[in-house]
Amino acid sequence: LSIRRQRQMCIRDRELYEAIAGEGRMLSKRLKEALNYRKGGNTGFETCITRLQMQSYVCIADFVYMQDRYGRPYGWGVAEYATPEELFGYDLITSAYQRDPQESKERILKHLQSRLPNATEMQLEKIIKG
C-alpha cells in the first residue's frame, strides 16, 4: 500500500480494497460474488464500499449496463470500481501528496468558482464541507 494507504483499515475494507486493486477495475456485482456478499454470507457491502470511497481509497470508474441476448443494454448501470491510481495514474495521485491542505482547498474553490460562477464564497465553502 502506498503512503496514503497506510492508515488503519478494517479487515473487510482491506479485503474489498485489495480485490479492486488486484483487478484494476471491478464491477460491484463481481465484488459481491468474489467476497461472498450475498444472502447467508458477508453483510455490510454498501457500508464498506462507501467508507472506502469517502476515504478516497476507491472511486467509481464507470457504470456498466448488462446486455440482453441481442447485445442491447438494459436496466440500471452497475458500478465499476477502481483505485484513484488506476484511474488517474500513480504519478498524478502521488504528486498531490506534496501540497498542503490549504493549497488543495484553494484549488478546489477555484475550480468550483469556474463551474459555478454565480455561487458565493459561502455557498462554495458549504459544498466542500458537505
Identify the function of each model-found stretch.
Residues Q67-S114:
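Short, amphipathic alpha-helical interaction segments positioned at domain boundaries
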Residues R12-R38, D91-T94:
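Short acidic, glycine/Ser/Thr-rich loop/turn "cap" segments at secondary-structure junctions
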Residues L1-I11:
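Single conserved hydrophobic/aromatic residue that forms the stacking wall/gate
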Residues G22-N36, I108-K110, S114-G130:
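Short acidic, hydrophobic short linear motifs in intrinsically disordered regions
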Residues R38-M54, I60:
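Short amphipathic alpha-helical interaction segments
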Residues R12-Y17, S28, F45, P101-L109, ...:
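Short, leucine-enriched amphipathic alpha-helices that occur as contiguous helical runs
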Residues Y17, A21, K32, E46-I49, ...:
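Short, well-ordered alpha-helical packing segments
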Residues L16, I60-F63, W76:
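Surface-exposed cap/loop segments at beta↔alpha junctions
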